[in-house]
C-alpha cells in the first residue's frame, strides 16, 4: 500500500466540489462528492437516540437503493431537532440534488453539520446547489464540510489487486462533540474497487470499532455522526469477495484510511495542543484493551495533565481501574513516550529532563501493559485546554 498526495476525487470516476453558499458568514459551507456511475455504498451512523434529519434520509436511502451516485453536504446548520419541517427539508435537499444530476433521489446521500435546532435556509441551499459543478475543486469540498475544525483532514492511498491498481481516499471533519460509538464527526471515503455493497458494509463494520469508535475529544456524541463509503468499480479489478486474501487486503487498506482520519480528528480537537495515543497491550482480549484505552484517553484529568505536561501516572491508573473491564490491575506497567513511570503497579523514578522532552511534544503516547494476555487496543484523543472551554462557551444555539 502506498500513500499518495491526493484528494477525495483521486479514485477513478469520482469528482468533488465545494463553495460558499451562505450557511456561514464567510467560509466555505456547501459541497458534494459525485461518482460517474452508481457506486456500492456502506454506512455507519450516530448511536445518539436523537438522530438528525439528514441521517434518517441517508440511512433510509442506503438501505433501500444499495447504491449511491453522490453525497451532498452543508456545514453551519445541522438540521437536527427540527421536527417534521427539518425532515421535509432534508428530503428536498436530496430531491434537488437528484434533479440536478438526473438520478433517482435514493441515489443521493445528504449530510449536515453545525448548529443544532436551526432549519436549513432552503433558498441558500438552492442557490448553492446551482453553483456546484461536477469535476470541481475537490480540495474545496474538504474545506466546505468543516465547522470548528482548524484544518482539513484528508488521506489517499493506492494498492494493487492482481494487475489492477485500486485507489482509496478519505475526507473527514470533526473537532468537538467527538465520542463516537462510532462526534460531530462526518467521514466520507471513496474507492474505485469492484466490491458489492454487502461486502463493503462488512469491511466498514469490522474496522469502525478499531478506528473512529476509538477516538474521543470531549465525551459528547453528536446527533449527526455519519461515515459513508462509496466504491464504484472503475478500477476494473476482479470483484472482492468476503473470506479471501483480496478482502483482507482491502480491509487493511480501509482500516489505514479510517485510522489516519480518526487520528487527524483527534489531533484537531477543539482547543487541542497535543494528540494523545493510548496503547493497552498484553490484555486478555482486544475488546477489553480498546475499552481500557478509551477510558484513559477520555479521562478529563488525564487530558488536563497532558495539557499541563504533568506525567501524572495516578490519573492514568485511576482511568484503567474504572474502565469497566474485569482485568487484574496489580501488575500494571505504565510508560509515557516509552519511559516507565510505573512498573508492577508501583511508581518508579525517571529522568526529569527526558520526561520534560516527552511531555513537551505535540504527540504523547501512553502505554499500559497489563501482563495478562496477548491482545492490544489503541485509542486517540487530545489534551483539554483553556481554549476548549472558550470555544464552546462562545458557540451559540
UniProtKB/Swiss-Prot annotation:
Keyword terms of this UniProt record: Acyltransferase, Amino-acid biosynthesis, Arginine biosynthesis, Autocatalytic cleavage, Cytoplasm, Multifunctional enzyme, Transferase
Any one GO BP annotation for this protein: L-arginine biosynthetic process
A Pfam family that the UniProt record links to this protein: ArgJ
InterPro entries reported for this sequence: Arg_biosynth_ArgJ, ArgJ-like_dom_sf, ArgJ_beta_C
Gene3D superfamilies listed in its UniProt record: ArgJ beta chain, C-terminal domain, L-amino peptidase D-ALA esterase/amidase
Superkingdom to which the source organism belongs: Bacteria
GO molecular function: glutamate N-acetyltransferase activity; L-glutamate N-acetyltransferase activity
UniProt keyword annotation of Cytoplasm present: yes
GO cellular component, one term: cytoplasm
Role this protein plays: Catalyzes two activities which are involved in the cyclic version of arginine biosynthesis: the synthesis of N-acetylglutamate from glutamate and acetyl-CoA as the acetyl donor, and of ornithine by transacetylation between N(2)-acetylornithine and glutamate.
Record's subunit section: Heterotetramer of two alpha and two beta chains.
Family per similarity comment: Belongs to the ArgJ family.
Protein name: Arginine biosynthesis bifunctional protein ArgJ
Organism (species): Streptococcus thermophilus (strain CNRZ 1066)
Amino acid at each position: 500500500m502506498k500513500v499518495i498526495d491526493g484528494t477525495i476525487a483521486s479514485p477513478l470516476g469520482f469528482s468533488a466540489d465545494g463553495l460558499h453558499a451562505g450557511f456561514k458568514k464567510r467560509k466555505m459551507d456547501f459541497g458534494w462528492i459525485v461518482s460517474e456511475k452508481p457506486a456500492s455504498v456502506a454506512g455507519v451512523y450516530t448511536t445518539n437516540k436523537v438522530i438528525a434529519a439528514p441521517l434518517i434520509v441517508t440511512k433510509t436511502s442506503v438501505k433501500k437503493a444499495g447504491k449511491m451516485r453522490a453525497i451532498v453536504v452543508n456545514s453551519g446548520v445541522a438540521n437536527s431537532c427540527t421536527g417534521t419541517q427539518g425532515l421535509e427539508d432534508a428530503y428536498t435537499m436530496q430531491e434537488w440534488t437528484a434533479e440536478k444530476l438526473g438520478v433517482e433521489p435514493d441515489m443521493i446521500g445528504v449530510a449536515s453539520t453545525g448548529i443544532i435546532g436551526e432549519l436549513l435556509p432552503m433558498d441558500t441551499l438552492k442557490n448553492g446547489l446551482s453553483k456546484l459543478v461536477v469535476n470541481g475543486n475537490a480540495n474545496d469540498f474538504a474545506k466546505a464540510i468543516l465547522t470548528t475544525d482548524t484544518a482539513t483532514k484528508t488521506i489517499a492511498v493506492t494498492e494493487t489487486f492482481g494487475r489492477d491498481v485500486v485507489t482509496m481516499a478519505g475526507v473527514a471533519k470533526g473537532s468537538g462533540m467527538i465520542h463516537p460509538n462510532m462526534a460531530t464527526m462526518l467521514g466520507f471515503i471513496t474507492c474505485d474497487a469492484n466490491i458489492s455493497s454487502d461486502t463493503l458494509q462488512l469491511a466498514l463494520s469490522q474496522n469502525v470499532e478499531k478506528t473512529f469508535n476509538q477516538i474521543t475529544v470531549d465525551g459528547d456524541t453528536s446527533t449527526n455522526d455519519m461515515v459513508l463509503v462509496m466504491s464504484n468499480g472503475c478500477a476494473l479489478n476482479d470483484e472482492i469477495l468476503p473470506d479471501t486474501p483480496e478482502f483482507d487486503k482491502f480491509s487493511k487498506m480501509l482500516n489505514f484510511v479510517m485510522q489516519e482520519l480518526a487520528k487527524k480528528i483527534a489531533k484537531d480537537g477543539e482547543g487541542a495542543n497535543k494528540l494523545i495515543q493510548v496503547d493497552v497491550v498484553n490484555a486478555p482480549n482486544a475488546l477489553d484493551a480498546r475499552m481500557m484505552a478509551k477510558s484513559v484517553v477520555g479521562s478529563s484529568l488525564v487530558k488536563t495533565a497532558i495539557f499541563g505536561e504533568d506525567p501524572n501516572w495516578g490519573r492514568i491508573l485511576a482511568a484503567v481501574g474504572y474502565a469497566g473491564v474485569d482485568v487484574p490491575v496489580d501488575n500494571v506497567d505504565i510508560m509515557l513516550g516509552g519511559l516507565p513511570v510505573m512498573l508492577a503497579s508501583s511508581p518508579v523514578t525517571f529522568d526529569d529532563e527526558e520526561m520534560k522532552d516527552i511531555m513537551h511534544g505535540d504527540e504523547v503516547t501512553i502505554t499500559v501493559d497489563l501482563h495478562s494476555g496477548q491482545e492490544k487496543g489503541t485509542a486517540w484523543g487530545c489534551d483539554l485546554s483553556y481554549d476548549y472551554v472558550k470555544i464552546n462557551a462562545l458557540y451559540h444555539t
